[in-house]
Amino acid sequence: MQPKDLAKKLFSEKFNRTSELNVYAPGRVNIIGEHTDYNDGFVMPCAINYGTAVSGAKRDDHTFCVYAADLDQFDRFRLDRPIEQNPSEKWTGYVRGVVKFIQERCPEFTQGADLVISGNVPLSSGLSSSASLEVAVGKFCQQLGELPLSNTDIALIGQKAENKFVGANCGNMDQLISALGQQDHLLMIDCRSLETKATPVPHNIAVMIVNSHVKHDLVTGEYNTRRQQCEAAAKFFGVKALRDVSIQQFKEKEAELTALDGEAAKRARHVVTENQRVLDAVDALNQGDISRLGELMGQSHDSMRDDFEITTPEIDYLVELAQQVIGKSGGARMTGGGFGGCIVAVAPVEKVEEVRKIIADNYQKRTGIKEDFYVCTASQGVHLC
C-alpha cells in the first residue's frame, strides 16, 4: 500500500475518525551537484516517486499527537509550551523541530492535531527521507493553521529544523526539491538565490537508483567535518562561500592552500569543479546530449571519490558495474551525502534491464550485501492528496 493510502487508513484506525488534511512530500535523487548546496552553489536534483504522507485532523486543544506508522511509535507534545527534544526517539526531532520553527515564524500557531506519518523512502539511503518528512509536516502545519508560508518558506524551515534541532548540518537542496519539484523535470537550484530552472527529462531516458545498503548517518562526524573544511577553504580565499571561487582562481592559489591544508584544498577542488559541472550539465540536457551529461556524472563521481573522499568500495563497484553497460549512452555516480547510500544512473530506457542484471549478478557476490534497484519518475513536489 502506498504511503498516501496507508496514512489515511491508519489514521481512522488509530484515532477512530476520518482525516481532514492529507499531505504528501517526495524524496529526491540528485543527478549532479554534490556537497555544493551548503557552499551556496548549484545542484540538479529531481523529486522522486517515493515519499512521506501525513494524514491528520484538528484537535480541540494544543497537543500534537503523532503516530509514525513505519516505526509503530507515538509522540505527544504541546504547542502552548516550549517544544523540547525527545531524546529517546530520534525521528521525533524532525517533527518537533519543524513545528518549533514554524512557531518562530508564526507565533499564533498553537492548533493541536492528531496525525499519522507514513513513508517509503528507504532510511539512510541518501534519498532524503528526512527532508520529505520535514516538508510534509511543514505543509501540514501551514494548511492546518492557514499560515502565510510559501513552499520555499516551508523548505527552509525544514532545513533549519535539521540544522538546529536534529543537529545535521545539511544544506537546503533536499528540502527545496521536495517542496518545489516538478513532474518529469530536473530542477537546477541556485542554493544562494534560491532561483530554480526546470529542465525536462527526455522521455526515452530512465533514472535508476541502486541502494547499496551500506548505511550512512549524517548526524555523526564526517559530513559536518566536510562542511567545516569547506568553510576553512572559503576563508582562505577571502570569500563568503566556495561558490564565489572560479576554477581559474582556485588553480592560481591551489599550491598555496595545499601547503597550508592539503585536505581543505582537495575538498575545495571538488566543490569548485562540481559547481561548473552542474552548469555544464544543464547545457547538455538542454541540447539533449545525454552522453555529455553522463561524462559529467562520471567526473563528479571521481571527484567525490578522490577529492571529497566520501564514497565506499561498494558504491564505487556499483558505479563501475552500471557504467560497463551504459558506456557513453548515459552515466552513473554516487548520490547523496556519501559513506554508503545510493548510486544514480541515467541511461536510455532499453538499458534498464541490462543494468539491473549486471548488478544482480555481481554486487552481492562480491560484497555479501543485497542491493535494491528502483526505476524512478521525476515527480511533483509537496501537495495535498
Swiss-Prot record:
Its main location: cytoplasm. Keywords: ATP-binding, Carbohydrate metabolism, Cytoplasm, Galactose metabolism, Kinase, Magnesium, Metal-binding, Nucleotide-binding, Transferase. PROSITE patterns: GALACTOKINASE, GHMP_KINASES_ATP. Signal peptide: none annotated. It comes from the Bacteria. Its EC number is 2.7.1.6. Pfam families: GalKase_gal_bdg (PF10509), GHMP_kinases_C (PF08544), GHMP_kinases_N (PF00288). It is found in: Cytoplasm. It catalyses: alpha-D-galactose + ATP = alpha-D-galactose 1-phosphate + ADP + H(+). Pathway: Carbohydrate metabolism; galactose metabolism. The keyword Kinase applies. The keyword Mitochondrion does not apply. The active site is at residue 174. Mg(2+) binds at residues 130, 162. GO terms for biological process: galactose metabolic process. The record marks 28 as: Transition state stabilizer. ATP binds at residues 124-130. Substrate binds at residues 34-37, 223. InterPro entries: Galactokinase (IPR000705), Galactokinase_bac (IPR022963), Galactokinase_CS (IPR019741), GalKase_N (IPR019539), GHMP_kinase_C_dom (IPR013750), GHMP_kinase_C_sf (IPR036554), GHMP_kinase_N_dom (IPR006204), GHMP_knse_ATP-bd_CS (IPR006203). One of its GO terms (cellular component) is cytosol. NCBIfam families: gal_kin, PRK05101.1. Belongs to the GHMP kinase family. GalK subfamily. Catalyzes the transfer of the gamma-phosphate of ATP to D-galactose to form alpha-D-galactose-1-phosphate (Gal-1-P). HAMAP family: Galactokinase. This is Galactokinase. It comes from Mannheimia succiniciproducens (strain KCTC 0769BP / MBEL55E). The lineage of its organism: Bacteria, Pseudomonadati, Pseudomonadota, Gammaproteobacteria, Pasteurellales. The gene is galK.
